[in-house]
């Protein structure tokens, strides 16, 4: 029996009433994963034994009637540390790495008696926008298996969209939660930088990375964020902000709220069908009583260039720790210490990772630092100031999540610049450290289209409030792909 059409609250009621046990729910989830895995390829590791052991222990202890997450399975992106469960970052470099500690986000989930069911596929070290750079496999879009799921958190998105799991965790450095959420018709949120601890997240761009939730609905997304968020002494970038319940404003009226629509987000490079969907959503918000006005974010056009200098520079530094000495892959034919370093990194990293390491090393090198990295930091400040000016007068910003719907497999993975430009609408949010959500807003040629709502720092509750207002008066989130029992 499958329970994947039940909401978290419905599952909780079944567990509390003992109509099902945690073991039965876990077994059913494992069956859902197995039944769909060949078609979509969401997982790198399925933690059957560990999950069933945890579920049995929970049944013996008893489900907490006051904890809606008690006994709920959770899929975790494979760059988030899980004690005793392989954490590979989808790289040959870490193909056999089994952490001895949990990431804080995972530990928080365990504290709420959630059950980690497996680790999801991703772009190698989270570097990519299509989940095609994984060392292990290519994940496929839940709606059309000839298309990409987005990236880098593609596996976490398809696991939810295809009905393998109800909830999952991803990470977002330049759009890696929101873009795959848009491509697969699910809800994905990138929290404010520092709202969720980065302890245990394998670092890509340390000033940009953020762990966040995927779910089929806005409420369930907010419920999962309430579990994983919070300040953490183990993370020096963790914000001293503690919000117990991110669902607190869900259901409140949005009448009179001012929402900005940047003209740059509907300009050159945006598919006309995506633009049409976003404008229709804007009109829908007006019917709900919100005030929609056009604004300008003039420096957002520089976001992609700024991002790939800063992110690659930070990556070149962060990835220096992978050298074949203490853990992970080591080249077998090395004859000296220098040989170990050179051959291990040459053989262990994929092409995209090596490309970004080289770009970052160049940007940080003597004679080029001022022209590239320092200049990128200055333009980043201008992007931040653009957002601050808008949020002085508006509650939220509205726009598309991605310039197109999901593209076909093997079409952009050999064109790095085209792949990078696919993130032009999500990258500015990371550069500014802001929260943003992608929610289902329609379809273009049968493929899901995501709507992005961006807020000032620590405004997640308001974002959820507005997102639910849209979700509750539309049915896009209810439409499911054929693999999940839908008719598309």
Swiss-Prot record:
It is an enzyme of class 6 (ligase). The active site is at residues 77, 152, 176. It catalyses: L-glutamyl-tRNA(Gln) + L-glutamine + ATP + H2O = L-glutaminyl-tRNA(Gln) + L-glutamate + ADP + phosphate + H(+). Its EC number is 6.3.5.7. InterPro entries: Amidase (IPR000120), Amidase_CS (IPR020556), Amidase_dom (IPR023631), AS_sf (IPR036928), GatA (IPR004412). One of its GO terms (molecular function) is ATP binding. One of its GO terms (cellular component) is glutamyl-tRNA(Gln) amidotransferase complex. GO terms for biological process: translation. Coiled coil: none annotated. Allows the formation of correctly charged Gln-tRNA(Gln) through the transamidation of misacylated Glu-tRNA(Gln) in organisms which lack glutaminyl-tRNA synthetase. The reaction takes place in the presence of glutamine and ATP through an activated gamma-phospho-Glu-tRNA(Gln). Heterotrimer of A, B and C subunits. HAMAP family: GatA (MF_00120). NCBIfam families: gatA (TIGR00132). Belongs to the amidase family. GatA subfamily. This is Glutamyl-tRNA(Gln) amidotransferase subunit A. The gene is gatA.
């Amino acid at each position: 029996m499958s329970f994947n059409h039940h909401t978290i609250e419905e599952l909780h009621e079944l567990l509390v009433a003992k109509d099902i046990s945690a073991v039965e729910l876990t077994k059913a989830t494992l069956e859902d994963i197995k039944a769909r895995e060949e078609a979509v390829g969401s997982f790198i590791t399925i933690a059957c034994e560990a999950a069933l052991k945890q579920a049995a222990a929970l049944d013996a202890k008893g489900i907490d009637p006051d904890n809606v997450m008690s006994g709920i399975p959770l899929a975790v992106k494979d760059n988030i540390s899980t004690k005793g469960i392989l954490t590979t970052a989808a790289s040959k470099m870490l193909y056999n790495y089994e952490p001895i500690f949990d990431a804080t986000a995972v530990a928080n989930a365990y504290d709420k008696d959630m059950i980690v069911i497996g680790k999801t596929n991703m772009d190698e070290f989270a570097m990519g926008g299509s989940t095609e750079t994984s060392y292990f496999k290519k994940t496929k879009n839940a709606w059309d298996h000839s298309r990409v799921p987005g990236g880098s958190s593609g596996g976490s998105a398809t696991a939810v969209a295809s009905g393998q799991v109800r909830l999952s965790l991803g990470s977002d450095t330049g759009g890696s939660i929101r873009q795959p959420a848009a491509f697969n018709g699910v809800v994905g949120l990138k929290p404010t930088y520092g709202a969720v601890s980065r302890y245990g997240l394998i670092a890509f761009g340390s000033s940009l990375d953020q762990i966040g939730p995927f779910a089929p609905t806005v409420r369930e997304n907010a419920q999962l964020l309430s579990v994983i968020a919070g300040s953490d002494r183990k993370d020096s970038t963790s914000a001293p902000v503690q919000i117990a319940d991110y669902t607190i404003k869900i259901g409140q009226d949005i009448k009179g709220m001012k929402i900005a629509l940047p003209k740059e987000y509907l300009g050159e490079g945006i598919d006309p069908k995506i633009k049409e969907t976003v404008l229709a959503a804007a009109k829908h918000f007006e019917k709900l009583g919100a005030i929609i006005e056009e604004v300008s974010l003039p420096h957002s056009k520089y976001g992609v260039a700024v991002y790939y200098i800063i992110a690659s520079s930070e990556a070149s530094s962060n990835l220096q720790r992978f050298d074949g000495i203490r853990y992970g892959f080591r080249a077998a034919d090395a004859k000296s210490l220098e040989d170990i370093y050179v051959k291990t990194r040459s053989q262990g990293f994929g092409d995209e990772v090596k490309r970004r390491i080289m770009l970052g090393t160049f940007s940080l090198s003597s004679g080029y630092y001022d022209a590239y990295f320092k200049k990128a930091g200055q333009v980043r400040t201008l992007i931040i100031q653009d957002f601050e000016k808008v949020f002085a007068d508006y509650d939220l910003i509205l726009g598309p999540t991605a310039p197109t719907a999901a593209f076909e497999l093997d079409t952009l993975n050999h064109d790095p610049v085209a792949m990078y430009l696919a993130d032009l609408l999500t990258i500015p949010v990371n550069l500014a450290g802001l929260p943003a959500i992608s929610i289902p807003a329609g379809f273009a040629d049968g493929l899901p289209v995501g709507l992005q709502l961006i807020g000032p720092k620590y405004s997640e509750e308001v974002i959820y409030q507005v997102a639910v207002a849209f979700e509750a008066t539309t049915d896009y989130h209810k439409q499911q792909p054929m693999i999940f029992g839908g008719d598309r």
